[in-house]
A protein has these predicted regions:
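Conserved CoA-thioester-binding segment of acyl-CoA-metabolizing enzymes
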Residues: 1-62, 98
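An acidic, glycine-rich surface segment that forms the CoA-thioester-binding/catalytic face
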Residues: 40-44, 51-52, 75-112
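Short beta-strand/turn micro-motifs composed of small residues
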Residues: 62-63, 111
Length: 168
């Protein structure tokens, strides 16, 4: 669910790689890079691996394919688990993103496509977010549905752009 590698010049590349259900990609499936508990654990493990690698100076997060950085949490996974599991899933995801945010190495989110919902929350945990022109939508659509972003996205957004801009 996460491809991890280190380039010759010390960049740890963490590539999110899943279909719309959050399952591993198979032939013919579109990479939407939604995350499940398993992927979030893989992200957490990759972040820790990069942190402890003295040869790594930069961590770069990206999504597999050209259309999505990440479409956020897998709705099918969230629909199939208990409220208690959802609570601990969101808690672990928030802890993982906080760990990413507090990593003393430079963290770059390379937005290669849409970054919505939890996908944007992952990107906001990076030090720098970059994307190509017209690469896709960026937003927290759950807020317009009256749902609080599950991994601290509203708080991260207001810290990044200020409260007034975040309210827009």
């Amino acid at each position: 669910l996460v491809n991890y590698g280190v380039t010759d010049n010390g960049i740890a590349v963490i590539e999110l790689c899943s279909d719309s259900a959050g399952d591993p990609l198979t032939e013919g499936k579109t990479p939407v890079n939604t995350y499940t508990n398993a992927m979030m654990r893989d992200i957490d493990e990759a972040v820790l691996k990069a942190r402890f690698d003295d040869d790594v100076t930069v961590i770069m997060l990206t999504g597999h394919g050209e259309k999505f950085f990440s479409a956020g949490a897998s709705i099918s996974m969230l629909d199939s688990v208990s409220p208690g599991f959802k609570y601990f899933f969101c808690l672990h995801a928030n802890e993982t993103l906080s760990r990413l945010e507090q990593t003393p190495k430079l963290v770059i989110a390379a937005l290669n496509g849409h970054a919505v919902g939890g996908g944007l929350e992952i990107a906001m945990a990076a030090d720098i977010r970059i994307g190509r022109k017209d690469s896709g939508q960026v937003g927290l659509p759950e807020v317009s549905l009256g749902v609080l972003a599950g991994t601290g996205g509203t708080a991260r957004l207001s810290r990044l752009v200020g409260k007034a801009k975040a309210m827009e």
